[in-house]
UniProtKB/Swiss-Prot annotation:
GO MF term set: DNA binding; DNA-directed RNA polymerase activity; ribonucleoside binding
Protein name as annotated: DNA-directed RNA polymerase subunit beta
Principal cellular location given in the protein's record: plastid
Broad class of enzyme this protein falls into: transferase
Length: 1060
């Protein structure tokens, strides 16, 4: 069995490839810079560049809000020539700072962890397709995609004439393009396989009779120039530069794909589109037109490439060098103009490179803030694959075939783990064994079955290559050698499923989880779940909150250990030695005569406000080995991932409190801190140096609001703060208006010219819902380029302890999610035959319709494991061993638990897995036996404390005069269509009228209503229409429709027209 590669390995390999190869490649492209008079030459030495070790550590960069980066030094030479002498000066100069990847596979920019995710793009090369035109006739096209995404289309019509389109503009003859590229008619006809098809264009000799005419025609179409341009050498050079060199650059990957598709032998370093490529592409298009070739599947992974962190960082480095070149040219010109002596150091500085990476990490769509909700989230985020981003697709234009699962995804992209919503299928996740190959392709490992050697050899295959082999399905892994010779096994061949003899098998899978992502691989019994529910579970595991008392799962899959190890949450011994000292802050390890200090994470805030904390697990004097675990991190126990709790669950309805995914829980989960979690919130205030003042003397504020401030006006560590308390006292000076001057102030200003200032209270106050304990206060200085713009910010970190409560969201590992609806006293909960009350009650109707039966297997096996004190690690698709293997395993464990505990009710043959339980309120047994078990239940980050919101007054929409929408905008309630139906159903006409009209969007009436409610008067009835109705009338008028209403008399039925 092969070992699973590190989950962060793709990020590490990409960054190392950028450092080892990408920097050298881009520096080799840096040109030799000369002035117009050739007096000064400036160039870089490719052989000599170095990255120095970062000046700060990762922890300090996060704490002080700095960028964890390394300085890049390059050797440069300057040659200065004048009439008599020649000066040569060589220096090692600093050209900028490059952010360095941390041990988490992420970058630290301004104290924030950021990750660069991988992007899937269409690979450069040529692709042949067939589409139906408006007349229902098949049109065959060959599309040449350049390295940057530009397109050149070859199209063959019914008369077998070949046309060319540039960026989907008007088509022109292929002979015009070839002539503009430098070929004459004779060379064209001699180098194609079907010259007779090209002769049909020769009637128009005026356009293609000469190279000049072809260049003019092509330039007119390409540049969209009106009129008749005149040929010149500059026009020809402009066309060569803008089109044939910039827009038609294939790159190394594109050149390789063109050679393989068209059977060419053009050197790999020739990365531009050549006339030979166009001729070969036209020949292949003619063959496909007449049925002598195959079309390309654009969604096949062999036609895609991965744009990794190495490619993105190298691209930004090349952009920075272009800016550096322009700076050097400008400084050389300034040196000659102002007659000052240049040196390599003063020709360039570090600003272009540093600013380029600063903008990239802040604004680029593929640079995202690392999600650190729990350890699993960190490693999954770095393994994402995105079709979105620059050069990629958009969520609005991506079609269903692009989002759908493709057979080439097998073992490379997880078919389950993807986003929900508009980005479904566009953001995927790497399979756990996949890796990125040399040419940007996704490779998957297989075992090659050889007759010569008894053992199997592992090899990585790129997409498309495995289709030429007979690949055995995963169930063949369980067959021993004796049975294999007689068995027929299912296999894959050319995207089809076959049944073949074992002797015909050439490759087989290496691991049961090979085609799943990390999130899907952590779901036990995943084969018994619907794929939609498995997708939800993969996403919800990343939303689990680390609990204060973590507990590892009874039923797992075996990947929990490596997930915890690769997440960086654990403290690992890098050397063997002896523990010299340990406390909650650090561990001192002595070995080889040195003492190594290992700092531990102490109540660190993640960007999702969860608490990251490490607990030492070694004692003083203990000898440890390299790789041993020294401290557990958040959501880890025993070196394994521990996201939730094993709780006793009954699947039964209970008084309607678990209707529609609601969950009923016991108060034991609250009082014993089973689902208690810690959350850290950050509150920040900026202080301008000079005028603003931090102080604890704030006038006009009550004393109890300032009770936690120290003498400097900042809240003290360890203080317990409530809503409205002052965290930082700040006064901002403001000038008094002329009209508010007192007479004596006006006299002083007139005589002495003095201005009177007052101070405005701009303190940092604790908002609603922020109560907790202050655990840290930081002063952070952010310096701008201008010395006068230096600002300071004070950050206050407050720790909150949150028990589980009504409104919180919980979920299992099978897509079974729900909201806490009621917390019952433990004596009222249903209890088992041994007297134990259950902890949660789930609705059984949520299982059959959603087809996630895996939760039943996990629940029953978890109960058996709890009684037998065992933990199970089960690989998926265990039916490959025998039929009903999962059911047999669960029932056998329940039966054994029943025997060992002498409790026959645990396994009753009449209803295996079910048991008679009793109503805690009456003591009577329920009518039917109920499934009970111990599944692994997670508490998710969607908590009611973050969702609940109230508003008394606030801002209104300028257009509709209704309250704004959303908690972030401090919005209010908006009565929608379904709310109106609910009120109509109860016949509350007056409440409905008030909520829809003068309490909502009637500007004048809502002020009167407020006054009458305060003083206890009768609510007035407004005479005119509310603002939303007036807006509706105005919109109708913009469509030239006038809205009026009429009164019909009962006596005369005459229409008395009255204006609206």
């Amino acid at each position: 069995m092969s070992t699973i590669p590190g989950f962060n390995q793709i990020q590490f390999e990409g960054f190392c490839r950028f450092i080892d190869q990408g920097l050298a490649e881009e520096l080799s492209k840096f040109p030799k810079i000369e002035d117009t008079n050739q007096e000064i030459d400036f160039e870089f030495f490719l052989e000599r560049y170095q990255l120095v070790e970062p000046l700060i550590k990762e922890r300090d960069a996060v704490y002080e809000s700095l960028t964890y980066s390394s300085e890049l030094y390059v050797s440069a030479r300057l040659i200065w020539k004048n009439d008599r002498r020649r000066y040569i000066q060589e220096q090692t100069i600093l050209i900028g700072k490059i952010p360095i990847m941390t041990s988490l596979g992420a970058f630290i920019v301004n104290g924030i962890y950021r990750i660069v995710i991988n992007q899937i793009l269409q690979s450069p090369g040529i692709y042949y397709q067939s589409e139906l035109n408006d007349n229902g006739i098949s049109v065959y096209t060959g599309t040449i995609i350049s390295d940057w995404g530009g397109r050149l289309e070859l199209e063959i019509d019914r008369k077998a004439r070949i046309w060319v389109r540039v960026s989907r503009q008007q088509k022109l003859s292929i002979l015009v393009l070839l002539s503009a590229m430098g070929l004459n008619i004779r060379e064209i006809l001699e180098n194609v396989c079907y010259p007779e098809l090209f002769l049909s264009f020769l009637n128009d000799k005026k356009k293609i009779g000469s190279k000049e005419n072809a260049i003019l025609e092509f330039y007119q179409q390409f540049a969209c120039v009106e009129g008749d341009p005149v040929f010149s050498e500059s026009l020809s050079k402009d066309l060569q530069k803008k089109f044939f060199q910039q827009r038609c650059e294939l790159g190394g990957i594109g050149r390789r794909n063109m050679n393989r598709r068209l059977n060419l032998d053009i050197p790999q370093n020739n990365t531009f589109l050549l006339p030979r490529d166009i001729l070969a592409a036209a020949d292949r298009l003619i063959r496909i037109k007449f049925g002598m070739g195959t079309l390309d599947d654009m969604n096949h992974l062999q036609n895609k490439r991965i744009r990794s962190v190495a490619d993105l960082l190298q691209e930004q480095f090349g952009l920075a060098l272009v800016r550096l070149e322009n700076m050097a040219r400008g400084n050389i010109y300034a040196a000659l103009k102002h007659n000052w002596t240049p040196t390599p150091q003063n020709l360039v500085n570090s600003t272009p490179l540093t600013d380029t990476y600063k903008v990239f990490f802040r604004l680029h769509p593929l640079s995202q803030v690392l999600d650190r909700t729990n350890p699993l989230t960190q490693i999954v985020h770095g393994r994402k694959l995105s079709y979105l981003g620059p050069g990629g697709l958009t969520a609005r234009t991506a079609t269903f075939p692009i989002r759908d699962i493709h057979p080439s995804h097998y073992g490379r992209i997880c078919p389950i783990d993807t986003s929900e919503g508009i980005n479904v299928g566009l953001i995927g996740s790497l399979a756990i064994h996949a890796r990125i190959g040399r040419w940007g392709s996704l490779e998957s490992p297989f075992y090659q079955i050889s007759e010569r050697s008894k053992g199997a050899q592992m090899l990585y295959l790129s997409p498309g290559r495995d289709e030429y082999y007979m690949v055995a399905a995963g169930n063949s892994l369980a067959l021993n050698q004796g049975i294999q010779e007689e068995q027929v096994v299912p296999a894959r061949y050319r995207q089809e499923f076959l049944t073949i003899a074992w002797e015909q098998v050439q490759l087989r899978s290496i691991f049961a989880f090979q085609y799943f992502s990390i999130g899907a691989s952590l779901i036990p019994f995943i084969e018994h779940n619907d794929a939609n529910r498995a997708l939800m579970s993969s996403n919800m595991q990343r939303q689990a909150v680390p609990l204060s008392q973590s507990e590892k799962c009874i039923v797992g899959t075996g990947l929990e250990g490596q997930a915890a190890l690769d997440s960086g949450a654990l403290a690992i011994a890098e050397h063997e030695g002896k523990i010299f000292y340990t406390d909650t802050d650090k561990i001192l390890l002595s070995g080889n005569g040195d003492t190594l200090r290992i700092p531990l994470v102490m109540y660190q805030r993640s960007n999702k406000n969860t608490c990251m904390h490490q607990k030492p697990q070694v004692r003083r004097g203990k000898c440890i080995k390299k790789g041993q675990i020294l401290a557990y991190g958040a959501a880890t126990v025993g070196g394994e991932l521990a996201l939730g709790k094993n709780v006793l669950v009954a699947y039964m309805p209970w008084e309607g409190y678990n209707f529609e995914d609601a969950v009923l829980i016991s108060e034991r989960l609250v009082y014993e801190d089973i689902y208690t979690s810690f959350h850290i919130r950050k509150y920040e205030i900026q202080i301008n140096q000079g005028p603003e003042r931090v102080t604890n003397e704030i006038p006009h504020l009550e004393v109890h609001l300032l009770r936690n401030l120290d003498k400097n006006g900042i809240v003290m560590l360890g203080s317990w703060v409530e809503t409205g308390d002052i965290l930082v006292g700040k006064l901002t000076p403001q000038m008094v208006k002329e009209s508010s001057y007192a007479p004596e102030d006006r006299l002083l200003r007139t005589i002495l010219g003095m201005r009177v200032y007052t101070s405005k209270e701009t303190c940092l106050k604790l908002p609603i819902g922020g109560r907790g304990r202050v655990i840290d206060v930081r002063w952070v200085q952010s310096s701008k380029t201008d010395e006068t713009e230096k600002t300071e910010s004070i950050r206050v970190y407050i720790l909150q302890k949150r028990e589980i409560k009504v409104g919180d969201k919980v979920a299992g590992r099978h897509g079974n999610k729900g909201i806490i609806s009621k917390i019952l006293p433990r004596q009222d909960m249903p209890y088992l035959q041994d007297g134990r009350p259950v902890d949660m009650v789930f609705n059984p109707l949520g299982v059959p319709s959603r087809m996630n039966v895996g939760q039943i297997f996990e629940s029953s096996l978890g109960l058996a494991g709890d009684l037998l004190d065992r933990h199970y690690r089960i690989a998926p698709f265990d039916e490959r061993y025998e039929q009903e293997a999962s059911r047999k395993l669960v029932f056998s464990e329940l039966y054994e638990a029943s025997k060992q505990t002498a409790n026959p009710w645990i396994f009753e043959p009449e209803s295996p897995g079910k048991s008679r339980i009793f109503d805690g309120r009456t003591g009577d047994p329920f009518e039917q036996p109920v499934i009970i078990g111990k599944p692994y239940i997670l508490k998710l980050i969607h908590q009611v404390d973050d969702k609940i919101h109230g508003r008394s007054s606030g801002r209104y929409s300028r257009l509709t005069q209704q309250p704004l929408k959303g908690r972030a905008k401090k919005g209010g309630q908006r009565v929608g269509e379904m709310e109106v139906w609910a009120l109509e159903g109860f016949g509350v006409a007056y409440i409905l009228q008030e909520m829809l009209t003068y309490k909502s969007d009637h500007i004048r009436a809502r002020q009167e209503v407020l006054g009458t409610i305060i003083f206890g008067g009768r609510i007035p009835t407004p005479e005119d229409a509310p603002e939303s109705f007036r807006l509706f009338v105005r919109e109708l008028r913009s469509l030239a429709l006038e809205l009026n209403h009429f009164l019909v008399s009962e006596k005369t039925f005459q229409l008395n027209r009255k204006e609206a």
